[in-house]
Amino acid sequence: ALLALPGMAGALLDEAQRSGRYARLAEIFHASRNFLYLGRGMHYAIAREGALKLKEIAYIHAEGYPAGEMKHGPIALIDEEWPTVVVAPQDRVYDKMVSQVEQIKARRGKVLAVASEGDAYLAGAADYVLPIPAANEFILPILAVLPLQLFAYEIARRKGLDVDQPRNLAKSVTVE
């Protein structure tokens, strides 16, 4: 599975460039002021990375939150003005993530789903799908982070920001 990773990542990046999907999403979401990112299990860290990337290079407030804890706070924020990005590839926690998407949609929230290619259910349930190749569950988090980084990158570009030199960010952390 690990040997196939570079090819899968390359194909994902090629498809993203060919389709123009992320530039179109940036056009839709560049003026959004807040985002909620949800992930469960291994994908919680990926959701946090996606939120962090959006903050760092697009200067948009974003929170990465464990999907299982959504009812303990973030659910109160969900509406049509606060988009939610869910990391929901087909793996052992998929059904629980589908339930989260349904709860968000019941509150008229906009959902962008990082989902496995060919996932017909999320293609219909989410407002937008960021597809990743089907893969071994231990490879999925590596693939799932790519759409989130592309999304942040395109939003920053759409806003005219320098993605190579984000403001107030150091390339290293110094311990005193």
Please give the residue ranges for each predicted region.
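Active-site phosphate/pyrophosphate-binding segments
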Residues: 1-83, 156-176
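Short alpha-helices
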Residues: 4, 125-176
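Glycine-rich phosphate-binding loops that contact phosphosugars or nucleotide phosphates
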Residues: 4, 40, 87-132, 151, ...
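Glycine-rich, anion-gripping cofactor-binding loops and their flanking helix/strand elements
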Residues: 69-105, 135-149, 157
